[in-house]
């Protein structure tokens, strides 16, 4: 079951290096079951890593827990996130994972979405400009805040957190 933070790293490693999959062997990669335990950022990262993986299979280890139940409702009520899974949008890694076993920045093949992960235990800025993608405006699907990506190529993320940006222009 996919419930530890290291499992999120494992999935990102698989999708970083597994893009030999071209829908001829398997139609979808397999993100495994997504659990919502741990803190909010970790649960969000598990959900978003499943989007990168290509499908969603949701479950939780304790849906009776009020905090986890709120987290489930919050994270799974974002229709645009669910549409990414429904539309089978494929993501590819766009950063070099020299010091890690996985990429931290992914772009959808249709260039409509960028996903950024901070898989460290500290808050940090993840920079994307060196990745060859130069979007101008991105909208964070979680906060609905628009970001001028032409003014900054770095995105501040809390420890073990992630975001999904819709590329506006």
Residue ranges: model-predicted function:
Residues 1-144, 155-164:
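Active-site-proximal substrate-binding groove within the catalytic cores of carbohydrate-active enzymes
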Residues 165-169:
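Short beta-strand-to-coil "C-cap" segments at the C-terminal boundary of structured domains/repeats
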Residues 149-154:
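Short, solvent-exposed S/T- and G/P-enriched segments that are highly enriched in secreted/extracellular
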